[in-house]
Structure formats: C-alpha cells, structure tokens
Curated annotation (Swiss-Prot):
Tissue distribution of the protein: Reproductive tissues, lung and heart.
Short motif (Cell attachment site): ranges: 89-91, 703-705
Entries under Gene3D superfamilies matching the protein: Immunoglobulins (2.60.40.10)
Domain Ig-like C2-type: 22-129, 149-268, 276-389, 406-527, 544-662, 688-813
Motif (Endoplasmic reticulum retention signal): 424-427
Signal peptide positions (record): 1-21
Biological role stated in the UniProt entry: Inhibits the binding of prostaglandin F2-alpha (PGF2-alpha) to its specific FP receptor, by decreasing the receptor number rather than the affinity constant. Functional coupling with the prostaglandin F2-alpha receptor seems to occur. In myoblasts, associates with tetraspanins CD9 and CD81 to prevent myotube fusion during muscle regeneration.
Membrane topology value: Single-pass type I membrane protein
Bilayer-crossing regions: 833-853
Taxonomic source organism: Rattus norvegicus (Rat)
Cytoplasmic domain ranges by topology: 854-879
UniProt record, GO biological process: lipid droplet organization; myoblast fusion involved in skeletal muscle regeneration; negative regulation of translation
Official protein name in the record: Prostaglandin F2 receptor negative regulator
Subcellular location: Endoplasmic reticulum membrane; Golgi apparatus, trans-Golgi network membrane
Length: 879
C-alpha cells in the first residue's frame, strides 16, 4: 500500500501560485461630494512585473455599464471629446504621487460627475494574472449648507482689556442625507491664524493651542442658540484676543461606518480691537536725604479703568539711571491681595486709592542711586482667576544721600605721671564739644606711642591698641604681650572718656603718646563704617633717670673672741634713687687668703628676703642646725649671729643686700644689689697642725688582687691626747691617668666610726677601717681593670677644746697616688688555648674517621688479574 501525498498543502501552494498577480486598488465604498467641491480619488497598483513606473487610465460611467475614457498618464489622445476642455482648463487632472500611485482630481464637481470611476493599468507583466482595474462609485449632492454671521456686514468690536464679548455664527443644512455639522472658531492676526475652540461632528469640544486653560476655567465657551446659531463667549478679553474672528463650518456624512467630510465653509464674523489700558506713574525726579534719616518716595497711579482692577506695586533699586531691571534689586512688593513683601528696613504702604509710598529707614550712602516703581493692573477673570491688563514702569527717581559728619574735639591729659621706673602712668583721652553725635554714631579710640629722639629724625608711631566699631579691642605688636600680662590696661570710663594705664612704667616707655578718636556710623545691616578720625595733641612721658645707689656697711660689735664663742655681725644699708625699697640679705663666707683647703670658694649660709622670710642656704652642719641666726633690727639694719663657732668657721663674712622696689600689688622688682665690706673670723691659736698622706706597698697589681691603701695622719705642733682627737676620713678615686675627671667617693668613715660606701658599677668591693689612731686602711677586693687611677684621702680633724666641746678643724687632702691594674696573661689565655686544642683534636679525629669510612666502603673497586699465556718454546731443530 503506497504512502498518501499531502494534498491540502499542495492545493494551498497551487492556489497561492495561481492567485498571485497584479492588484489595482481604489478606495472601497461610495464617495460623497457636494456640488462645487473638489473630488480626489487615489489609485495604486502592486505585485506587478516590468518597469517600476506604471501608467494609469481613468474611465467614467454614469450608470456603471459603459465607460467613457476620462484621462490617461501615458496616452495623450485617450480622453473622450467631452472631457478634453476640462482637462485643458485643469479642472480635471492626474497627479502622480508615486511610481505605482496616482490621484484623479476633479475641481468644481457637478451633478453630471456622479457615477462610477474605473482605474486601470496597461499590462507590463510576463503573464497575465491578477486584476488590472478597480471601480468606485461617487455621489454628488446639492449644496445645502448655509453659513453666515449673525449680522451683515461683520461688526467691528472695540473693547477694553478685561471686558466680555460674544460672537455668533449661523450654520444649517438641508441635505436629504443624514449629515452632521462641525464648527470651529478661528482668530486671524495677519498671516497667522489660531484655532480658538471647535465643536466636532461627534459633538465634542476641542480648545485650540493656548486656549486650554481659558476653556477649562470657563473664560472661553461655545454653545448653541436656537437651532442654527453658534455662540463664542469670552468672559475677559485679553490683548491677545485682538484680531479677525472667522467661523469655519464643515459637513460630515457617514458611509459604511466611517465619517467623511463632504464640504467646508468659512465666514468672517467680526473684527475685535482691544484698547490698551491707560496707565501712568508719577514719582519724584530727585530726592536728597541726610544719612541716618528715613527716605520716603511716593508712586502715584493714573488709569482710565474704573472697574474692579487691583494694582500690584513693586519698587526696585539700582545704581544706573536706565529703566532696565537688569542689575536691579527688589526692595518691596505689594501684591494684588495687599500683602507686602519687603527687605529689612524697608516698608511699602498704601496711602490712598492711587498712591503708594516706599519708606527706607536709616539710609546710608549705599542707598544713593535710582529707584523705579513698577505697577501692574490685574482684572478678575472667570472662576476666581486673575489676568494682567496693564503694566507700566516709572521714570527713575534719583536719590542722593548726604552725610553730615559729627563734630567733636579730642583732649589728652596725663592723670598720673611717673617719677621713677615702675611707677604707674595713666592717660585720659576725652571727647569734648560734640555735635551731631546721635545714637547712630559710635566713638572709639586708638592709642599710639612715638619714641623721643634728640635729633630731628622722624620716628614712626607705633600702634598700642585700636578699638573697632563693634567695641573689639585689638593690640599692637608693642603692647600685645604686656596687655595680656595685665601691665597695659585700656578702658572706657565714661561715654566721652577713654583711659590708658601702664601699671609699671619702664624706661623704654618714655616717649610721646597720643590718641585718635574715630566716629563710626551704623549701617542697615547692623555693621559699622568709620567716617571720621580726630587726633589729640601728644603728651610726653619722661623722668630724669639716675642710677640707683645701694651702700652696705658691715661691722663687728664685739671684740676678738675664741673658738666656741658667739660671732655677731651687723649690716647697715643706705640707698638713693630707689622708690620705697625693701631689702633682702644673704650672708656669705669665704676662706681667708692663704687657706689652701678650699681656695676661692664662697659659701652661702643664711638669707632673709624682702618679706622677712629666713632660709638656710648651704649650712650643712647637722650638729648646729640652730647655730646661725639672721634677723631684721630696723628697716635698714640686719644682724647675723653664729653660735659655738668652730675653727673651721674661720673666713671672711659679708652681707649681700638686694634692694627691691614695688611694682604694684604683691610684685617686686630688683632695683640694685651691693656687697658689704668683709668681717674676718681668725682664730689665733698654737694648736696642732694636721697633715695627710697615702701609702701603698704595691702600686701595680694584677686583676683580681687586693689593693691596700693607707691614709696616714701626722700631727705637728702641740701634743694631743689620742682621746682628744677624732677624724672624718673619706677616700676618693679619679679613674684616669690625669686628674681631669670628677673624683668618685669610694668610702667614708666619720669620727663616730660609721662607714658609708659609695655606689659603683663594677664587681670589685671596697672596705674602710681604722688601723690605728692615725692610720686608716682602704682595701679594694677582687680588683678590676676599672679600678686603676689616682687615689687620695680627705681628712677633717676634730679636737676637743678645754671646755669639752669638739672643734672641727680645716679639712685636709692628701696627695694622690696612682694605682695600676695589670691583666694576668696566663689566666687570660689558658682557657682559650685548651678549648682550641680540644676542638682541633676532635676535628682531626673526625676527619680521619670520615676518610677511612669513605675509602673502605664507598670507593673500593674489584681488580681482576690479567693472565698471561705461557707457551713453551719449541726447539727450532725439531721437525
């Protein structure tokens, strides 16, 4: 059984191939036109072969049975005789719109043009297939549309802006067919026409561009009056409404469910002229006002409108006299609701119906310029809307602000003049004979200093302080630090008085001083601008400077005394050219000339300051803490006492006196310092003379050995019982080859047997002991390299006096002895040698072991012996 063929698909392809061919089309349905209008019938061809540009033939038949040639695009003699005249006049013509499309135009259609129109195309195809013609029916109706204005000729309306107006258009039709009318109002102004409002054939309203808002607000309306009148109503006329108004009416008919316009007529209804609203403004031409006063400008309005219009008034300010608003500043605005919008210090008021006043308070020079008044008139519209009916700008009003500067004089005097250094100085700068200094003017001061010169050289003034208009005080470089420290005080005592006070006047402050009083004027933004400066005459601050003189005389009231007695010394002070002096006293002591124990050494013992506060300075004798007293006998006399004097107290004693001068409050300034004549304490005695020396059996030791040093005290002169002698012994070392370093305390032993050891940074230790009455042994155990150097001892002898008190003698020092610490070479190299030999032996044995193992196991090869063949020699005689 065979496979069936796909018959449906094959039949479809076959029918598509057969049906495909040329297609000629004209609009489907019936085309309706009115007598006198233009008829346009389009025709196009598709799916054809041959050239791209196709030709068309048009034929007409009134009944649809026999067609008469009407027009052709390619054959001149194609039209019938009755149509050739209309073709020549252009009433009938063909207009090609594309290579495959053409339009038939028949102007001024007549009833005889009603019938059937056929469009055909000559064949250019290889095979004839498809349709080559298409036909449509045209109906021609009589003109039954009547359009006209409500009155003839068209009226001319003259209106004012804001007034209402109405226009009417009559339109009707008596067509036997069911037709609809569409109406459109247009405004023509020269070559430009605008659509205002239209009523479509479907009964819908369409406002034109720019009229949407007015239509929705009800300002522009379109309604019918009766059966044939259409009324355009404008509630408020605008200047843009001026022009010629036309009523355009079109008639529509429905054919096979679609609407088509069959004719359109237009008629001139009216010409509307909008008269502009007269608006004039009057402002003063020029105004002069004093700075600080109020500026009052009026803007008077004149208009021919008597209806309900509301003005909007705006004032502008600018620096140039033109009327352009460029680079202008708006000052105030009164809107149509009578709400005022203004900048600070500006007010806008409504005086009467047609007068508006601008008030600028507290004017300044910045207000000089030109003022413009801009007025706009607003008329109410439909549905609470407003529209502008007029606007005008006034001529510029020139305003000049004059300044009447304040008048005053400045007088400077010195209320306090210094007689000495550190005395206060006070200057007062007063403002007198003031005129025109009101609340809008502030007076501030600046202080200046100028150094006096003996010659005629000009010296620049130095600013001390300046006060700005906001009362801010700024210091100059000369006075900044001293003002911050409170030495310079600038103040305003009264409204007209400024003061400058120097708490402590120095010689550098001598010179000329003057003040400058500045007038500041307040601006509208609450800022202050300087307007005037007035200088005072200078005041010279000077006093004759003489050197301060301070003389101190010391005396010893009691005669010569012995050790253990009380020493007393008084110091009398006298001064000149020092203001209200107070004295501080320092007692000093120096060793007498020839004392080698501590030459040129000055020791401070006790002091008393200018407030009578006593202080022990370098008095270190703990056993005699209360042994010295310094007291004030009179304002210029002081007494020093030292109880239980020692032989070691011998020396030259002086009073060092410093004079202090008050500089204000509790502060004092050092005025002068002087040293009194010396008072000597010299104990004439035949007592023993002590000497000290250092001895060592070994001056060179090996590191680690014991260093033994003896401090030996010898006594010359009087023989003393050992129980009447005691010694303070201290050992010092200078660890250098010379004595160029500071000595280091090793150990000390006081007369009571208490040992004190100094701090050291290495391991060796020291010990100090008394070997005999006059010998003291210092031992350095386990000496180090750092222990080399110069060693010496310091001895302070103590001797018991016949009264039983101990007297300290002068401290004595031994000559230094140099100790050398050597290094033990054998001990130093013993351990490194043993370690080196041991390491070498171990490394050698290890190398031998490695070599043996390598040769025995790793590098051994089997050697084969080569055998040689031994053959016996045969006798040559053998056969």
């Amino acid at each position: 059984m065979g496979r069936p063929a796909p018959r449906p698909l094959l039949l479809a392809l076959l029918s598509l191939a057969v049906c495909r061919g040329r297609v000629v089309r004209v609009p489907a349905g019936t085309l309706v036109r009115v007598v006198g209008t233009e008829l346009v019938i389009p025709c196009n061809v598709s799916d054809y072969d041959g050239p791209s540009e196709q030709n068309f033939d048009w034929s007409f038949s009134s009944s649809g049975s026999s067609f008469v040639e009407l027009a052709s695009t390619w054959e001149v003699g194609f039209p019938a005789q009755q149509y050739r005249e209309r073709l020549q006049r252009g009433d009938i013509l063909l207009r090609r719109t594309a290579n495959d499309a053409v339009e038939l135009h028949i102007k001024n259609v007549q009833p005889s043009d009603q019938g059937h129109y056929k469009c055909s195309t000559p064949s250019t195809d290889a095979t004839v297939q498809g349709n080559y013609e298409d036909t449509m029916q045209v109906k021609v109706l009589a003109d039954a549309l009547v359009v006209g204005p409500s009155s003839r000729p068209p009226p001319g309306l003259s209106l004012r802006e804001g007034e209402p107006f109405e226009l009417r258009c009559i339109a009707s039709t008596t067509s036997p067919l069911h037709t609809h009318l569409a109406l459109r109002w247009e405004l023509h102004r020269g070559p430009v026409h605008r659509s205002i409002l239209a009523l479509s054939h479907e009964g819908r309203f369409h406002p034109g561009p720019g009229y949407e808002q007015r239509y929705h607000s009800g300002d522009v309306r379109l309604d019918t009056v009766g059966s044939d009148a259409y009324r355009l109503s404008v509630a408020r006329a605008l200047s843009a409404d001026q022009g010629s108004y036309r009523c355009v009416v079109s008639e529509w008919i429905t054919e096979q469910g679609s609407w088509q316009e069959i004719q359109e007529k237009a008629v001139e209804v009216a010409t509307v002229v909008i008269q502009p609203t007269a608006l004039q403004l009057a402002v003063p031409r020029t105004v002069s006002v004093t700075e600080g006063k109020d500026l009052d400008l009026s803007c008077n309005i004149t208009t021919d409108r008597v209806d309900d219009v509301r003005p909007e008034v705006t004032w502008y300010f600018k620096k140039t006299p033109d009327t352009s608003l460029l680079a202008s500043h708006m000052l105030a605005r009164l809107d149509r609701d009578s709400l005022v919008h203004s900048s600070p210090h500006v007010a806008l008021s409504h005086v009467d119906t047609r007068s508006y006043h601008l008030l600028v308070r507290d004017v300044s020079k910045e207000n000089s310029g030109y003022y413009l008044c801009l007025v706009a008139l607003w008329a109410p519209g439909h549905n609470r809307s407003w529209h502008k009916v007029a606007e005008a700008m006034s001529a510029p009003s020139g305003v000049s602000v004059t300044w009447l500067e304040p008048e005053y004089q400045v007088y400077l005097n010195a209320s306090k003049v210094p007689g000495f250094s550190d005395d206060p100085t006070e200057l007062q700068c007063r403002v007198i004979d003031t005129k025109r200094v009101d609340a809008g003017v502030r007076l501030t001061v600046s202080w200046y200093y100028r150094m006096n010169r003996r010659n005629d050289d000009v010296v620049a003034s130095e600013l001390l302080a300046v006060m700005d208009g906001d009362w801010t005080l700024r210091y100059g470089e000369r006075s900044k630090q001293r003002a911050q420290d409170g030495e310079f005080i600038f103040s305003k005592e009264h409204t007209d008085t400024f003061s400058f006070r120097i708490q402590r006047t120095t010689e550098e402050d001598r010179g000329s001083y003057y003040c400058v009083v500045s007038a500041w004027t307040r601006q509208r933004n609450s800022s202050w601008v300087k307007s005037k400066d007035v200088f005072s005459k200078p005041v010279n601050i000077f006093w004759a400077s003489e050197d301060s003189v301070l003389v101190v005389k010391a005396r010893q009231p009691k005669p010569f005394f012995a050790a253990g007695n009380t020493f007393e010394m008084t110091c009398k002070v006298s001064s000149k050219n020092i203001k209200s002096p107070r004295y501080s006293v320092l007692i000093t002591a120096e060793k007498p000339v020839g004392d080698l124990s501590s030459p040129n050494e000055t020791k401070y013992i006790i002091s008393l300051d200018q407030d009578s506060v006593v202080k022990l300075e370098n008095w270190t004798d703990a056993s005699r803490v209360d042994g010295v007293v310094l007291e004030k006998v009179q304002e210029d006399e002081f007494r020093y006492r030292m109880y239980q004097t020692q032989v070691s107290d011998a020396g030259l004693y002086r009073c060092m006196v410093t004079a202090w001068s008050p500089i204000g409050g509790s502060l004092w300034r050092e005025a002068a310092t002087s040293l009194s004549n010396p008072i000597e304490i010299d104990f004439q005695t035949s007592g023993p003379i002590f000497n000290a020396s250092v001895h060592s059996d070994t001056l060179s030791v090996t590191r680690g050995d014991l260093i033994k040093l003896f401090c030996i005290v010898t006594v010359d002169g009087a023989v003393l019982d050992p129980d009447d002698m005691a010694f303070d012994v201290s050992w010092f070392a200078v660890h250098s080859f010379g004595l160029d370093k500071a000595p280091i305390l090793l150990s000390s032993l006081d007369r009571k047997g208490v040992v004190t050891t100094g701090q050291r940074d290495w391991k060796s230790t020291v010990s100090l002991e008394r070997v005999s009455v006059l010998e003291f042994l210092l031992q350095v155990h386990s000496s180090e390299d750092q222990d080399f150097g110069n060693y010496y001892c310091s001895v302070t002898p103590w001797v018991r006096s016949p009264t039983g008190s101990w007297q300290r003698e002068a401290e004595i020092h031994s000559r230094p002895i140099f100790i050398t610490v050597k290094m033990d070479v054998l001990n130093a190299f013993k351990y490194p040698l043993l370690i080196g030999v041991g390491l070498s032996t171990v490394i050698g044995l290890l190398s031998c072991l490695i070599g043996y193992c390598s040769s025995h196991w790793c590098c051994k090869k089997e050697v084969r012996e080569t055998r040689r063949e031994r053959r016996r020699l045969m006798s040559m005689e053998m056969d």
